[in-house]
C-alpha cells in the first residue's frame, strides 16, 4: 500500500509539473510571437509526411529481420483513442477536446482517413494521405478510398466520407488554419470520395 501511495504521489507531482510546464511554454510562445509557426508545424512542411508514410510501410512490409517485402508481413489492427483528443497546437500544446470517440480498423491509412474526416478535415489536403494512396511499392492500403466502409453506433457517422460539413469540428494547428478544413478545402463542394 505504501508503494502504491508513493507512486500515486509521484504521479500527482508529475501532473502538476506538466501543467506548469505547459503554461510556461504557452507564455513563452505567446510573448515571443511564435504562434504562427513552430516545431515544423505548418502546412508547407515537406518532411513529416515522409516519416509517417515510411513508418507505415515498415510496419506492414518489414519482416522480423527488418527486410522489406512486397507482400504485407503481418496483420494490423489500429485503435485511435479519441475519448479526450487534442486540438489546436498539438502535439506539444494541444487543447483538450472531449469527443468520447474510439476508432478502429484493420488498415492504418483507412482508419486515419476516417478519423481525419470525422475531425472535419479534408484528407486530400494532407501530403501523407495523397502520397500513401499512390504508392507503387510497399502499398499501405491495397484498395481505393471509395471501398472504405465506416460503421458507427451514430448512424450519421456511417457515411462520413461522403458528407459535407464537419462532425466534431476540430480546430487545426495554427500553421494549418484555412488549409485543411472541409469548408476551406478546394474540393469542398463535391463529395469527399
Q: PLM features: what roles do these ranges have?
A:
Residues 1-193:
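Extended, low-polarity segments enriched in aliphatic/aromatic residues
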Amino acid at each position: 500500500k505504501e508503494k502504491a501511495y508513493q507512486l500515486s504521489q509521484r504521479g500527482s507531482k508529475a501532473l502538476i509539473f506538466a501543467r506548469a510546464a505547459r503554461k510556461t511554454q504557452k507564455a513563452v510562445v505567446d510573448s515571443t510571437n511564435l504562434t504562427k509557426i513552430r516545431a515544423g508545424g505548418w502546412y508547407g512542411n515537406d518532411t513529416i509526411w515522409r516519416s509517417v508514410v515510411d513508418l507505415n510501410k515498415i510496419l506492414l512490409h518489414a519482416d522480423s529481420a527488418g527486410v522489406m517485402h512486397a507482400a504485407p508481413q503481418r496483420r494490423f489492427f489500429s485503435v485511435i483513442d479519441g475519448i479526450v483528443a487534442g486540438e489546436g497546437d498539438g502535439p506539444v500544446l494541444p487543447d483538450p477536446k472531449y469527443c468520447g470517440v474510439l476508432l478502429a480498423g484493420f488498415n492504418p491509412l483507412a482508419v486515419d482517413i476516417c478519423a481525419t474526416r470525422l475531425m472535419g478535415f479534408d484528407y486530400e489536403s494532407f501530403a501523407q494521405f495523397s502520397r500513401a494512396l499512390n504508392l507503387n511499392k510497399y502499398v499501405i492500403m491495397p484498395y481505393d478510398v471509395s471501398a472504405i466502409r465506416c460503421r458507427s453506433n451514430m448512424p450519421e457517422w456511417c457515411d462520413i466520407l461522403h458528407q459535407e460539413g464537419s462532425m466534431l469540428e476540430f480546430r487545426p494547428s495554427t500553421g494549418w488554419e484555412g488549409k485543411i478544413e472541409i469548408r476551406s478545402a478546394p474540393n469542398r463542394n463535391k463529395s469527399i470520395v
